[in-house]
Amino acid sequence: MCIRDRFFVPESPRWLVKAGKADRARAMLQRIGSAEYAGQTLKEIEHTLQKDNHKVAWSTLLQPQIKPIVIIGMVLAVFQQWCGINVIFNYAQEIFASAGFDINGTLKSIVATGIINLVFTLAALPLVDKIGRRKLMLFGASGLTVIYVLIAGAYGLGIMGWPVLVLVLAAIAIYALTLAPVTWVLLSEIFPNRVRGLAMSLGTLALWIACFLLTYTFPLLNASLGASGSFLLYGVICAMGFIYVLRNVPETKGVTLEALEEQLAAQHTKVCASTQPRSAR
């Protein structure tokens, strides 16, 4: 797939402008919009690249206009891991065994999780642009919340076997359709050009640290809370993730980086103003 994309996926307009190929960038923008849209967007890109044409220090990430975006990116990266789905992949044998499956049934269930993950990841590709990033994130967080509560209830009530398998497969399907691909799309879209490299590095670091903590804390959680309590905890985390996305994450579909930066900066200013004591105003 990577080799195929190397020949068929076009370069981004920003890269073309940066490489001195403004005419090709204009032509590409005209393919997805009008000539007026292409001209306006090209001007915004050129203005941004001229402004950002200097070496960026890590301290830039703490600037008032940039910091809220970096925080959103890191929270999304951590949430993608702490939603708990990788526990199912990493500890599938233990989870299915505790649900009453024998060795043969456990192996078949693990194969089923891989197939479901692949199918729904491919199905997500057209939906990201059709439905929108924010809606998919909200659907994923809310769907996983409900499913984890049901799994916790099943373990708590001693309901084993196929009901647990169906719920686990549903959780994987929702994750593969939403949080798994959309998180990376958002991370690639929300950061301004001048800090994208640094911010993406920080977001990726946060994601893998979260993955490490998730993977190595599940045995401890499972030992102290049991499967029911562990999945209930992941359900609470997903509910918190839903609230965070609802309040803080804008829709990036069809929004330029320049407009998105202004929108998030205005949102940050509004929040700061609302939390400032009246005596200080």
Question: Across the structure, where does each feature detected by a protein language model lie?
Answer:
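Short, well-structured alpha-helical segments
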Residues: 38-47
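Alpha-helical transmembrane bundle of multi-pass membrane proteins
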Residues: 1-30, 49-281
